Amino acid sequence: LKSGATCIAYETIEVNKRLPLLEPMSEIAGRMSVLVGGYFLPKHFGGSGVLLGGVPGVLPGKVVVLGGGSSGINAARMAQGLGADVTILEVDVERMRFLDITLHTAHTLYSNRAHILDMLPEVDLLIGAVLVPGSRAPKLIDREMMRVMKRGSVFVDIAIDQGGCAETSRPTTHHDPI
């Protein structure tokens, strides 16, 4: 500040309600969330043993994505590419229409506590991809809701850099993500 320099946090630059400089990182985070989450689903990692894409005679895994922004749509695309059954919960109806047209086989559902609770008992991989520009992420999942998830399910919270979207979320590292 003493130097008189003008400093700009690039990730917060907003153009037409979008964060264009944050988008590339969000795209990567969304895609990686499915790969990393799927990696921890085998039983030897404490997961449920579900293969996200399934195989003939076995249903695919269920992936639920909270938030349909850049991270969320990329998580959904990656999960669809693996053959998973994908549902995206979103609060913006126009965005849901876009997701429906763009992702074809993914289901969209209005995001609220009741719908999240309905999804949790069956989810194999839950991805938190909510972003409120300039604010902390809303806490969509509390401790009691986490207990509803089946044993061995995996939760990846992309929103952790904004405080996480679950009450139990805490920062981890790529080296030690659990």
What are these regions (language model features)?
Residues S70-A76, M96, G134-L140, G163-T168:
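Short glycine/serine/threonine-rich phosphate/pyrophosphate-binding segments
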Residues N112, L131-G134, A159-I160:
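Short glycine-/small-residue-rich Rossmann-like dinucleotide-binding loops
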Residues L19-L22, R77-M78, F98-I101, A166-R170:
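Short acidic, glycine/serine/threonine-rich loops at helix termini
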Residues G46-G128:
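Glycine-rich phosphate/diphosphate-binding loop of Rossmann-like nucleotide-binding domains
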Residues L1-G61:
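Glycine/serine-rich phosphate-binding loop and adjoining beta1-alpha1 elements at the start
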Residues P24-E27, L103-L109, T172-H175:
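Short, hinge-like loop/turn segments at secondary-structure boundaries
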Residues L1-K17, A137-I178:
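Rossmann-fold NAD(P)-binding glycine/threonine-rich loop
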